[in-house]
Design a protein with these regions (language model features):
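Short C-terminal tail/terminal secondary-structure segment
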Residues: 73-76, 127, 207, 218-232
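Canonical Rossmann dinucleotide-binding motif of NAD(H)/NADP(H)-dependent dehydrogenases/reductases
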Residues: 1-13
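Active-site helix of classical SDR
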Residues: 102, 138, 146
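Catalytic Tyr-X3-Lys loop
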Residues: 80-99, 114, 118, 135, ...
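Short, small/polar-rich loop/turn modules that mediate ligand/substrate recognition or access, typified
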Residues: 154, 159, 217-219
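Conserved mid-core segment of classical short-chain dehydrogenase/reductases
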Residues: 50, 73-88, 107, 111, ...
Length: 232
């Protein structure tokens, strides 16, 4: 996703706590002439979040697009087997951090009279999934805050939408080929297309929701899953 926005000439700011990966990616793209900055931001720390957006405003004066893509999951299990620590971490990263970032993003966008926010939810934000009560709660929450906030700021030239990815060929998912080949095969076969999605599929959807062509699209959740949720 960072690459795709950078390829289109955007000044991209990465917020994360994985410093090695973030700094390596930023350097790689900067060496190619792209404009990318990595900034360490702990999304559990509201002061760090606020300070990060103050820094954006001071450095760049505006914020045109925001992609809230933070996520965290736990092994599937019944709700009563989840610990309070697990609940707090999943809800904290997947919903509370996203909401807190949106608040700061909207403040800057309102001042400039323009903004595009894209949140990442999941099929778990549209359906109930056995063994995933906490994750479903968080991702359903992202859907709710996306839709409600979209109505709040529609007259401010700010659109707020969400993407619901299916199973995507990330490093984690690809690792299943070796450690759990049956699970990987099941993931492939569960897609109507018969194969997994690629990171570029998600990035393309995010870019589209930030383009002028989508300026009248607001408050929607776009499944990017080859039709998985269509049949459920």
């Amino acid at each position: 996703m960072v690459r795709m926005f950078a390829d289109r000439g955007c000044q991209v700011i990465i917020f994360d706590v994985q410093d090695d990966k973030g700094e390596t990616l930023a350097k790689e793209l900067c060496d190619q002439g792209k404009k990318v900055v990595y900034k360490h931001v702990n999304l559990f720390d509201i002061d760090e979040i606020k300070n990060a957006y103050v820094w954006i405003k001071e450095q760049f004066g505006k914020l045109d697009y925001a992609m809230n893509n933070a996520g965290f999951g736990i092994p599937a299990k019944p709700l009563d087997e989840c610990t309070s620590e697990e609940v707090n971490k999943v809800i904290g990263i997947c919903l509370i951090a996203v909401t807190n970032c949106m608040i700061e993003e909207i403040k800057i966008m309102k001042e400039n009279g323009f903004g595009r926010i894209v949140n990442t939810t999941s099929g778990a934000g549209l359906l109930g999934i056995k063994g995933n009560s906490v994750y479903c709660a968080a991702k359903h929450g992202v859907v709710g805050v996306t839709k409600a906030a979209a109505l709040d700021y529609a007259t401010s030239n700010i659109t707020i939408n969400a993407i619901a990815p299916g199973t995507i060929e990330t490093e984690l998912v690809n690792s299943l080929k070796e450690i759990a080949p049956d699970a990987y095969k099941q993931a492939e076969e569960s897609n109507p297309s018969g194969h997994l999605g690629k990171p570029e599929d998600i990035a393309n959807a995010a870019v589209f929701l930030c383009e002028d062509a989508s300026s009248f699209i607001n408050g929607v959740v776009l499944p990017v899953d080859s039709g998985c949720v269509a049949g459920k």
